[in-house]
């Protein structure tokens, strides 16, 4: 009965005592063992055990008060007493509680201080009361968590409770001492354990008084049979150390220790099993209590880690469209689009890639970032970003082509195929890399665009074309918002109509084959197809010949550095003079084209782009240097930028005069140079400014391309064909060949000014320029050889570029018409700078539409103006992308002449005017 009662009444005073005691016993045992081993001889435990066994068995059972005590829940009584004392604002200490119990319950035996302390600790543990230096207080919702924190502070709940109660109990008697003692207890488990033991002993004394209490105590103290003796011995130390309460405990324990131990022992034995069970239950309850106590804390912690399901539900409720599925779908779509684009580029670039991978990979290794940026650019729509993430294989493959590969190497290596090609490519790639690193955002934007408009995806090249045009008409904006403009460019590159149409027009298989056969540079141009497809290469060479002499000086070193054909570059320059019609082209391109570009993109890069135009000339080392210098000039000052620009521009004028038969080619070369410059500058500038330049080049390409197309009207028709084919095949290696070819072809073009043969010969430069425009699609860029170009065409078809091919056919026809008009306009443009500027404004307007139009998906109706814009943009992009392409164009004498034409008067102002002319030509062609 008593056992049952005690178990049942645990929550009553005895039961709570017992529960606490049971826990205490368990604790006491571990603590006691620790304490015994630490401070007490083993003998104490045995003695205690013996004492418990002998005297403890009978006394607790025989105690009469037990029945009453069991029925009197000490814990509840204490709670009532504490509540009453709190209401009376009396400090609740153990002594005060004893007095209160004695006063309020005169007939009930007063519990010993040890029992009282133990019960108070139990209540604290149960969070019914909480101790403070001022005494105990009833726990309220506001103070409910004070106890847990107190308990948590202590190493053990029991000890904490004990210590805390000690504080409270001693607070009124000895608040200062007690508080430190409590702290000490918390610090020293040994003392608290001793306290527990003492408490148990005290409880045992009380148990002697109250059988039930004693039994309960014994049950709990059974854990610590030895504990009481050690407690007695240790208590003095504990008293001083832990608290006065401890001292009380010690005193109590020492007095009734023997009897209590015996009674405890008996009670523990009697109730040991039941208490163990109860203890286990209590421990479970105790643990169960802990979670409730901690639940709020857990809840507080949980919000920081909301379950995935809940989080997703919240997201769904906030934005139903924003789901993991949708996000994954979006990501998958973007990946698919990029993969399609990459496949497209790879389809035509697989061969290119093998060839290009040999050199380009070396370059990539040296300029992995450049390549990455190239990819970014491709994604962005910049051919120089052929290695763009979107189309990593695209540009790379373009470079890979034996011919295209040289340009790629040009982008990556200075030594491959003449430093001007390689250096330019290197610079291009580096430039792409450094600027492109920022442009990765653009690639992301392109991915977004693709996600938004997946169908434009087919027009990778067209996206480049659109990007170029976007750059052209947004050149000023680019100065302000290069990043945003790049995003726009990419979005434009998303337009299928622009890239595909341009690519189709320029990249007809005929054009590809023609370009390939015509000039190795064409592949570079093809590679550069992004914005500076081929005009960029021609311009690259011209760029190398900032002046004729300058180009020779620079271009020769560059070519020598490239070891492709220094003489080729020089020859190109000089053959450029031979086809000074090409110089006319150069004039038109450098002065008008660049002017158009600069005028068109009057942003900081207008002169820089012009300056850059010569740099593509030197895709060779000189191109790289020029490009770098051009970039530096771009960065340093418009004057410096204009200086190469001016040099080129005079050549442009010189060449423009001879442009008679070769005027178209010269213009094409000039455009190519401008494009090459713009593109090369972008590639060369491995700096943020390079990015700007590239962006500027894109815009300028838009300007340059139409001009280039116009200039290379004759060569552009064939150029578009041969360019398309030669573009992919023109690499850095091809560029020297192109230079050689272009030199004779430029000579021929000089003789023929605009004859198809010149166009064919000049495709590296002029045709490439025209091809560049059409070769906006990365596929063309990917194709590195003439075969690569043809493959590129096929690849585009494979990539679903049939529309592009058709568009390219249309674009080619338009481009031819435009080039014819442009050729006709070429003389005009030099003459009518103001008209050209007006045209430039018109073209800027038309460029906006054309950038829309050029993308084969969105504005299939292409105005010649848009074609010109795209061509310039593509040529520029190609030139930027493929330094070799620029040299390929540069390979054409006109291109170099363009650069060589260093008309001081044709500097910034003339450049601006000539861009106006270029714009006018573009508008007129439209």
UniProtKB/Swiss-Prot annotation:
Coiled-coil residue spans: none
Compositionally biased region (Basic and acidic residues): 18-32, 379-393, 473-495, 633-658, 684-693, 785-799
High-level lineage: Eukaryota, Metazoa, Chordata, Craniata, Vertebrata
Positions with biased composition (Basic residues): 353-378, 463-472
Annotated stretches, region: Disordered: 1-32, 338-393, 452-529, 564-586, 633-693, 723-802, 823-926
PANTHER family to which the protein is assigned, alphabetical: STORKHEAD-BOX PROTEIN 2 (PTHR22437:SF2), WINGED HELIX DOMAIN-CONTAINING PROTEIN (PTHR22437)
Superkingdom of the organism of origin: Eukaryota
Polar residues: bias regions: 518-529, 746-769, 847-884, 914-926
Protein name: Storkhead-box protein 2
GO biological process: embryo development ending in birth or egg hatching; maternal placenta development; regulation of transcription by RNA polymerase II; response to bacterium
Organism: Mus musculus
